[in-house]
Protein backbone atom coordinates (compact mmCIF):
# COMPACT_ATOMS: atom_id res chain seq x y z
CA UNK A 1 0.00 0.00 0.00
CA UNK A 2 1.34 3.41 -0.91
CA UNK A 3 0.61 4.78 2.55
CA UNK A 4 3.54 2.82 3.93
CA UNK A 5 5.94 5.50 2.70
CA UNK A 6 8.81 4.68 5.03
CA UNK A 7 8.65 1.06 3.99
CA UNK A 8 8.96 2.12 0.38
CA UNK A 9 11.92 4.38 1.13
CA UNK A 10 13.66 1.58 2.98
CA UNK A 11 13.07 -0.86 0.15
CA UNK A 12 14.30 1.69 -2.38
CA UNK A 13 17.47 2.14 -0.32
CA UNK A 14 18.09 -1.60 -0.28
CA UNK A 15 17.53 -1.82 -4.03
CA UNK A 16 19.99 1.01 -4.64
CA UNK A 17 22.60 -0.75 -2.50
CA UNK A 18 21.98 -3.94 -4.43
CA UNK A 19 22.43 -2.17 -7.75
CA UNK A 20 25.72 -0.68 -6.52
CA UNK A 21 26.93 -4.03 -5.25
CA UNK A 22 26.00 -6.14 -8.25
CA UNK A 23 26.61 -5.43 -11.90
CA UNK A 24 23.97 -7.82 -13.20
CA UNK A 25 20.72 -9.54 -12.37
CA UNK A 26 20.14 -11.15 -8.99
CA UNK A 27 17.90 -14.07 -9.89
CA UNK A 28 18.75 -17.77 -10.43
CA UNK A 29 19.54 -19.81 -13.51
CA UNK A 30 19.51 -17.68 -16.65
CA UNK A 31 16.27 -17.37 -18.60
CA UNK A 32 15.27 -15.23 -21.56
CA UNK A 33 11.92 -13.54 -22.05
CA UNK A 34 11.33 -15.58 -25.22
CA UNK A 35 11.41 -18.85 -23.29
CA UNK A 36 15.06 -19.79 -23.85
CA UNK A 37 18.05 -20.03 -21.52
CA UNK A 38 18.96 -22.32 -18.64
CA UNK A 39 15.48 -22.44 -17.10
CA UNK A 40 14.01 -23.43 -20.45
CA UNK A 41 16.68 -26.10 -20.92
CA UNK A 42 15.77 -27.59 -17.54
CA UNK A 43 12.05 -27.98 -18.28
CA UNK A 44 12.63 -29.05 -21.89
CA UNK A 45 15.03 -31.79 -20.88
CA UNK A 46 12.82 -32.81 -17.96
CA UNK A 47 10.01 -33.57 -20.41
CA UNK A 48 12.43 -35.63 -22.53
CA UNK A 49 13.69 -37.40 -19.42
CA UNK A 50 10.16 -38.31 -18.36
CA UNK A 51 9.30 -39.46 -21.88
CA UNK A 52 12.28 -41.83 -21.86
CA UNK A 53 11.64 -42.98 -18.29
CA UNK A 54 7.88 -43.52 -18.67
CA UNK A 55 6.90 -47.08 -17.81
CA UNK A 56 4.80 -48.90 -20.40
CA UNK A 57 2.41 -49.77 -17.58
CA UNK A 58 1.40 -46.17 -16.86
CA UNK A 59 -2.39 -45.56 -16.98
CA UNK A 60 -3.67 -44.31 -20.31
CA UNK A 61 -5.00 -41.09 -18.75
CA UNK A 62 -1.49 -40.23 -17.52
CA UNK A 63 -0.11 -40.76 -21.02
CA UNK A 64 -2.87 -38.58 -22.47
CA UNK A 65 -2.19 -35.76 -20.04
CA UNK A 66 1.53 -36.03 -20.75
CA UNK A 67 0.79 -35.64 -24.46
CA UNK A 68 -1.22 -32.48 -23.71
CA UNK A 69 1.75 -31.08 -21.81
CA UNK A 70 4.07 -31.90 -24.70
CA UNK A 71 1.70 -30.23 -27.16
CA UNK A 72 1.95 -27.03 -25.08
CA UNK A 73 5.72 -27.16 -24.75
CA UNK A 74 6.35 -23.56 -25.79
CA UNK A 75 3.93 -22.31 -23.12
CA UNK A 76 5.81 -24.46 -20.61
CA UNK A 77 9.09 -22.88 -21.68
CA UNK A 78 7.65 -19.35 -21.57
CA UNK A 79 6.30 -19.99 -18.08
CA UNK A 80 9.69 -21.29 -16.97
CA UNK A 81 11.30 -17.90 -17.62
CA UNK A 82 8.40 -15.51 -16.90
CA UNK A 83 8.99 -15.01 -13.13
CA UNK A 84 12.23 -13.18 -13.93
CA UNK A 85 10.27 -10.68 -16.06
CA UNK A 86 6.99 -10.39 -14.16
CA UNK A 87 6.36 -6.63 -13.77
CA UNK A 88 4.65 -7.23 -10.42
CA UNK A 89 7.53 -9.28 -9.00
CA UNK A 90 9.54 -8.30 -5.92
CA UNK A 91 12.39 -6.08 -7.11
CA UNK A 92 15.06 -8.11 -5.31
CA UNK A 93 13.61 -11.50 -6.31
CA UNK A 94 13.32 -12.48 -2.65
CA UNK A 95 10.82 -15.22 -3.46
CA UNK A 96 13.34 -16.96 -5.75
CA UNK A 97 15.42 -18.03 -2.72
CA UNK A 98 14.87 -20.72 -0.10
CA UNK A 99 17.17 -22.15 2.54
CA UNK A 100 15.78 -25.63 3.32
CA UNK A 101 17.19 -25.52 6.85
CA UNK A 102 15.72 -22.18 7.95
CA UNK A 103 12.62 -22.29 5.67
CA UNK A 104 13.32 -18.63 4.81
CA UNK A 105 14.48 -16.56 1.88
CA UNK A 106 17.30 -14.07 2.37
CA UNK A 107 14.96 -11.29 3.54
CA UNK A 108 14.76 -13.04 6.93
CA UNK A 109 18.22 -14.59 7.11
CA UNK A 110 20.65 -11.94 5.80
CA UNK A 111 21.73 -9.14 8.14
CA UNK A 112 22.28 -6.54 5.40
CA UNK A 113 18.63 -6.69 4.35
CA UNK A 114 16.95 -3.74 6.09
CA UNK A 115 13.48 -3.76 4.56
CA UNK A 116 10.42 -5.80 5.48
CA UNK A 117 10.76 -9.56 5.16
CA UNK A 118 8.94 -11.43 2.39
CA UNK A 119 7.00 -14.57 3.29
CA UNK A 120 7.03 -16.06 -0.21
CA UNK A 121 9.92 -18.41 -0.95
CA UNK A 122 10.94 -20.48 -3.96
CA UNK A 123 9.38 -23.48 -2.19
CA UNK A 124 6.03 -21.82 -1.46
CA UNK A 125 5.89 -20.52 -5.03
CA UNK A 126 6.28 -24.07 -6.35
CA UNK A 127 3.15 -25.04 -4.40
CA UNK A 128 1.22 -21.92 -5.35
CA UNK A 129 1.79 -22.11 -9.10
CA UNK A 130 1.29 -25.87 -9.20
CA UNK A 131 -2.12 -25.38 -7.55
CA UNK A 132 -3.00 -22.65 -10.06
CA UNK A 133 -1.89 -24.92 -12.91
CA UNK A 134 -3.94 -27.81 -11.61
CA UNK A 135 -7.00 -25.57 -11.32
CA UNK A 136 -6.74 -24.44 -14.95
CA UNK A 137 -5.96 -27.95 -16.19
CA UNK A 138 -9.08 -29.36 -14.58
CA UNK A 139 -11.11 -26.67 -16.40
CA UNK A 140 -9.54 -27.67 -19.73
CA UNK A 141 -7.48 -24.48 -20.04
CA UNK A 142 -4.33 -26.38 -20.93
CA UNK A 143 -2.29 -23.49 -22.35
CA UNK A 144 -2.78 -21.37 -19.24
CA UNK A 145 -2.26 -24.39 -17.00
CA UNK A 146 1.02 -25.26 -18.70
CA UNK A 147 2.18 -21.64 -18.43
CA UNK A 148 1.43 -21.62 -14.69
CA UNK A 149 3.17 -24.97 -14.26
CA UNK A 150 6.20 -23.59 -16.08
CA UNK A 151 6.34 -20.84 -13.46
CA UNK A 152 6.18 -23.43 -10.69
CA UNK A 153 9.13 -25.22 -12.28
CA UNK A 154 11.04 -21.93 -12.55
CA UNK A 155 11.00 -21.69 -8.76
CA UNK A 156 11.86 -25.38 -8.44
CA UNK A 157 14.85 -24.71 -10.69
CA UNK A 158 15.85 -21.78 -8.49
CA UNK A 159 15.90 -23.85 -5.30
CA UNK A 160 18.29 -26.21 -7.11
CA UNK A 161 20.70 -23.29 -7.61
CA UNK A 162 23.48 -23.53 -4.98
CA UNK A 163 23.55 -19.79 -4.28
CA UNK A 164 19.76 -19.62 -3.90
CA UNK A 165 19.54 -22.62 -1.57
CA UNK A 166 22.25 -21.04 0.60
CA UNK A 167 20.55 -17.60 0.53
CA UNK A 168 23.70 -16.03 -0.92
CA UNK A 169 22.72 -13.04 -3.06
CA UNK A 170 24.67 -10.84 -5.45
CA UNK A 171 25.11 -8.45 -2.50
CA UNK A 172 26.70 -11.18 -0.39
CA UNK A 173 29.05 -12.41 -3.11
CA UNK A 174 29.98 -11.50 -6.68
CA UNK A 175 30.14 -15.25 -7.18
CA UNK A 176 26.35 -15.38 -7.40
CA UNK A 177 26.16 -13.78 -10.84
CA UNK A 178 29.45 -15.24 -12.04
CA UNK A 179 28.41 -18.79 -11.14
CA UNK A 180 25.08 -18.56 -12.94
CA UNK A 181 26.78 -17.06 -16.00
CA UNK A 182 29.26 -19.93 -15.88
CA UNK A 183 26.40 -22.44 -15.87
CA UNK A 184 24.53 -20.66 -18.68
CA UNK A 185 27.54 -20.82 -21.02
CA UNK A 186 27.95 -24.54 -20.40
CA UNK A 187 24.33 -25.61 -19.96
CA UNK A 188 24.25 -27.76 -23.08
CA UNK A 189 27.06 -29.89 -21.64
CA UNK A 190 24.88 -30.66 -18.63
CA UNK A 191 21.78 -31.94 -20.41
CA UNK A 192 20.48 -35.37 -19.45
CA UNK A 193 17.98 -37.57 -21.29
CA UNK A 194 17.11 -40.15 -18.63
CA UNK A 195 17.47 -40.75 -14.91
CA UNK A 196 18.33 -44.38 -15.60
CA UNK A 197 15.16 -45.73 -13.98
CA UNK A 198 11.52 -46.15 -14.95
CA UNK A 199 8.57 -44.33 -13.42
CA UNK A 200 7.45 -47.41 -11.49
CA UNK A 201 10.56 -47.33 -9.31
CA UNK A 202 12.85 -45.08 -7.32
CA UNK A 203 12.01 -41.43 -6.67
CA UNK A 204 9.22 -41.50 -9.26
CA UNK A 205 7.32 -44.17 -7.33
CA UNK A 206 8.03 -42.36 -4.06
CA UNK A 207 6.43 -39.20 -5.50
CA UNK A 208 3.02 -40.91 -5.43
CA UNK A 209 3.11 -42.27 -1.87
CA UNK A 210 1.90 -39.14 -0.05
CA UNK A 211 -1.54 -37.98 -1.19
CA UNK A 212 -1.08 -34.68 0.71
CA UNK A 213 0.43 -32.52 -2.04
CA UNK A 214 1.60 -29.68 0.22
CA UNK A 215 3.38 -32.09 2.56
CA UNK A 216 4.90 -34.07 -0.30
CA UNK A 217 6.02 -31.00 -2.23
CA UNK A 218 7.74 -29.38 0.74
CA UNK A 219 9.70 -32.53 1.58
CA UNK A 220 10.50 -33.16 -2.07
CA UNK A 221 11.81 -29.62 -2.51
CA UNK A 222 13.78 -29.90 0.71
CA UNK A 223 15.65 -32.97 -0.51
CA UNK A 224 16.80 -31.28 -3.71
CA UNK A 225 17.51 -27.90 -2.08
CA UNK A 226 19.71 -29.52 0.58
CA UNK A 227 21.85 -31.01 -2.17
CA UNK A 228 22.12 -27.59 -3.81
CA UNK A 229 23.05 -25.91 -0.52
CA UNK A 230 25.74 -28.52 0.13
CA UNK A 231 27.11 -27.92 -3.36
CA UNK A 232 27.45 -24.22 -2.56
CA UNK A 233 29.73 -24.81 0.41
CA UNK A 234 31.68 -27.69 -1.15
CA UNK A 235 32.23 -26.49 -4.73
CA UNK A 236 30.59 -23.15 -5.57
CA UNK A 237 32.08 -20.23 -3.63
CA UNK A 238 34.57 -17.70 -4.97
CA UNK A 239 37.32 -19.70 -3.22
CA UNK A 240 36.68 -22.68 -5.46
CA UNK A 241 38.25 -23.43 -8.84
CA UNK A 242 36.71 -23.65 -12.30
CA UNK A 243 36.91 -27.41 -11.98
CA UNK A 244 34.91 -27.17 -8.76
CA UNK A 245 32.32 -24.95 -10.43
CA UNK A 246 32.05 -27.39 -13.33
CA UNK A 247 31.40 -30.20 -10.85
CA UNK A 248 28.85 -28.07 -8.99
CA UNK A 249 26.98 -26.84 -12.06
CA UNK A 250 26.85 -30.28 -13.66
CA UNK A 251 25.38 -31.83 -10.52
CA UNK A 252 23.01 -28.93 -9.77
CA UNK A 253 21.60 -28.86 -13.29
CA UNK A 254 21.33 -32.64 -13.45
CA UNK A 255 19.38 -32.51 -10.18
CA UNK A 256 17.16 -29.72 -11.51
CA UNK A 257 16.29 -31.77 -14.60
CA UNK A 258 15.69 -34.97 -12.63
CA UNK A 259 13.70 -33.20 -9.94
CA UNK A 260 11.58 -31.35 -12.50
CA UNK A 261 10.79 -34.67 -14.21
CA UNK A 262 9.56 -35.92 -10.83
CA UNK A 263 7.40 -32.82 -10.35
CA UNK A 264 5.86 -33.31 -13.79
CA UNK A 265 5.17 -36.96 -13.04
CA UNK A 266 3.40 -36.10 -9.78
CA UNK A 267 1.42 -33.34 -11.54
CA UNK A 268 0.20 -35.79 -14.19
CA UNK A 269 -1.19 -38.03 -11.47
CA UNK A 270 -2.76 -35.13 -9.59
CA UNK A 271 -4.68 -33.99 -12.69
CA UNK A 272 -5.62 -37.54 -13.72
CA UNK A 273 -8.76 -38.07 -11.67
CA UNK A 274 -9.13 -40.96 -9.23
CA UNK A 275 -5.50 -42.13 -9.47
CA UNK A 276 -4.49 -40.63 -6.13
CA UNK A 277 -6.72 -40.59 -3.05
CA UNK A 278 -8.45 -37.24 -2.54
CA UNK A 279 -8.42 -36.78 1.20
CA UNK A 280 -9.52 -33.68 3.06
CA UNK A 281 -6.23 -33.05 4.87
CA UNK A 282 -5.74 -30.77 7.83
CA UNK A 283 -4.20 -27.41 6.97
CA UNK A 284 -2.33 -24.81 9.01
CA UNK A 285 -2.47 -22.04 6.44
CA UNK A 286 -4.06 -20.57 3.34
CA UNK A 287 -2.79 -18.79 0.25
CA UNK A 288 -5.12 -16.06 -0.97
CA UNK A 289 -4.68 -14.67 -4.48
CA UNK A 290 -6.60 -11.45 -5.22
CA UNK A 291 -6.82 -9.73 -8.59
CA UNK A 292 -7.68 -6.02 -8.78
CA UNK A 293 -9.69 -4.94 -11.82
CA UNK A 294 -7.98 -3.33 -14.79
CA UNK A 295 -9.82 -0.01 -14.65
CA UNK A 296 -8.92 3.58 -13.88
CA UNK A 297 -8.85 4.13 -10.09
CA UNK A 298 -9.63 0.46 -9.42
CA UNK A 299 -6.79 0.19 -6.90
CA UNK A 300 -6.90 1.27 -3.27
CA UNK A 301 -4.64 2.50 -0.49
CA UNK A 302 -7.21 1.67 2.17
CA UNK A 303 -6.77 -1.20 4.62
CA UNK A 304 -7.83 -4.61 3.29
CA UNK A 305 -8.51 -7.74 5.34
CA UNK A 306 -9.39 -11.38 4.67
CA UNK A 307 -11.36 -13.36 7.22
CA UNK A 308 -12.80 -16.80 7.92
CA UNK A 309 -15.38 -18.17 10.30
CA UNK A 310 -15.13 -21.83 11.24
CA UNK A 311 -18.18 -23.99 11.70
CA UNK A 312 -17.55 -23.92 15.45
CA UNK A 313 -17.90 -20.11 15.37
CA UNK A 314 -14.18 -19.30 15.68
CA UNK A 315 -13.27 -16.20 13.68
CA UNK A 316 -9.87 -15.20 12.34
CA UNK A 317 -9.00 -12.16 10.23
CA UNK A 318 -5.72 -11.15 8.59
CA UNK A 319 -4.44 -7.81 7.33
CA UNK A 320 -3.50 -8.12 3.67
CA UNK A 321 -0.41 -6.00 3.22
CA UNK A 322 2.64 -7.03 1.23
CA UNK A 323 5.78 -4.89 1.08
CA UNK A 324 5.50 -2.35 -1.71
CA UNK A 325 2.28 -1.35 -3.44
CA UNK A 326 -0.46 -3.95 -3.44
CA UNK A 327 -4.04 -3.68 -4.75
CA UNK A 328 -2.92 -1.70 -7.79
CA UNK A 329 -5.06 -1.74 -10.95
CA UNK A 330 -4.66 -5.01 -12.89
CA UNK A 331 -2.32 -6.38 -10.23
CA UNK A 332 -2.50 -9.87 -8.74
CA UNK A 333 -1.41 -10.13 -5.11
CA UNK A 334 -0.71 -13.27 -3.09
CA UNK A 335 -0.90 -13.57 0.69
CA UNK A 336 0.34 -16.43 2.88
CA UNK A 337 -1.90 -16.67 5.94
CA UNK A 338 -1.20 -18.73 9.05
CA UNK A 339 -4.21 -20.38 10.70
CA UNK A 340 -4.33 -20.35 14.49
CA UNK A 341 -4.02 -23.72 16.16
CA UNK A 342 -5.54 -26.20 16.11
CA UNK A 343 -5.19 -27.02 12.42
CA UNK A 344 -8.42 -27.43 10.51
CA UNK A 345 -9.71 -28.94 7.30
CA UNK A 346 -10.84 -26.57 4.57
CA UNK A 347 -14.31 -28.06 4.88
CA UNK A 348 -14.38 -26.75 8.47
CA UNK A 349 -14.59 -23.18 7.13
CA UNK A 350 -18.15 -21.88 7.10
CA UNK A 351 -17.71 -18.37 5.66
CA UNK A 352 -14.98 -16.25 4.10
CA UNK A 353 -14.88 -12.52 3.40
CA UNK A 354 -12.79 -9.56 2.36
CA UNK A 355 -13.16 -6.30 4.24
CA UNK A 356 -12.01 -2.78 3.42
CA UNK A 357 -11.50 -0.10 6.05
CA UNK A 358 -10.86 3.55 5.23
CA UNK A 359 -7.33 4.86 5.75
CA UNK A 360 -8.60 8.45 5.62
CA UNK A 361 -12.09 9.90 6.20
CA UNK A 362 -12.59 9.74 2.43
CA UNK A 363 -12.98 6.23 1.06
CA UNK A 364 -10.54 5.04 -1.61
CA UNK A 365 -12.95 2.64 -3.31
CA UNK A 366 -11.55 -0.60 -4.69
CA UNK A 367 -12.75 -2.78 -7.56
CA UNK A 368 -11.98 -6.46 -7.05
CA UNK A 369 -11.89 -8.66 -10.12
CA UNK A 370 -11.57 -12.05 -8.45
CA UNK A 371 -10.17 -14.20 -5.67
CA UNK A 372 -8.68 -17.68 -5.34
CA UNK A 373 -8.17 -19.49 -2.04
CA UNK A 374 -5.49 -22.19 -2.14
CA UNK A 375 -5.16 -24.94 0.47
CA UNK A 376 -4.20 -28.61 0.54
CA UNK A 377 -2.48 -28.36 -2.84
CA UNK A 378 -5.51 -27.08 -4.75
CA UNK A 379 -7.55 -24.00 -5.49
CA UNK A 380 -10.32 -24.77 -3.02
CA UNK A 381 -12.44 -21.74 -3.82
CA UNK A 382 -12.53 -19.36 -6.76
CA UNK A 383 -14.86 -16.47 -7.49
CA UNK A 384 -15.11 -13.78 -10.15
CA UNK A 385 -16.29 -10.81 -8.08
CA UNK A 386 -16.10 -7.77 -10.43
CA UNK A 387 -17.45 -5.46 -7.74
CA UNK A 388 -16.59 -2.09 -6.25
CA UNK A 389 -15.94 -2.26 -2.51
CA UNK A 390 -16.98 1.04 -0.93
CA UNK A 391 -16.17 2.66 2.40
CA UNK A 392 -15.90 0.31 5.37
CA UNK A 393 -17.52 -2.59 3.55
CA UNK A 394 -17.39 -6.30 4.37
CA UNK A 395 -18.00 -8.57 1.38
CA UNK A 396 -18.72 -12.27 1.88
CA UNK A 397 -17.19 -14.30 -0.93
CA UNK A 398 -19.12 -17.50 -0.19
Curated annotation (Swiss-Prot):
Ca(2+) 2 binds at residues 321-322, 324, 326. GO terms for biological process: killing of cells of another organism. SMART domains: Zn_dep_PLPC. Ca(2+) 1 binds at residues 299, 364. Its EC number is 3.1.4.3. Disulfide bonds: none annotated. This is Phospholipase C. It comes from Clostridium novyi.
Amino acid sequence: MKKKFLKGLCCAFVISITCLGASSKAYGWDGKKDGTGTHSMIVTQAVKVLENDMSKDEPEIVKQNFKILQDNMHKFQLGSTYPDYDPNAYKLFQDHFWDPDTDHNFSKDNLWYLSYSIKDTAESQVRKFTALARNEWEKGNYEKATWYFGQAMHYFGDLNTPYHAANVTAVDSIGHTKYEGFAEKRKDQYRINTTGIKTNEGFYADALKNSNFDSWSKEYCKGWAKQAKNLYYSHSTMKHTNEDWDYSASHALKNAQMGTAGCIYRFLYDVSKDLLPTENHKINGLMVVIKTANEIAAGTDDYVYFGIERKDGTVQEWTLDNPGNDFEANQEDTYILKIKKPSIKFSDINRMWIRKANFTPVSDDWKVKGIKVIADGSVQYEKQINKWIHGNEKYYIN
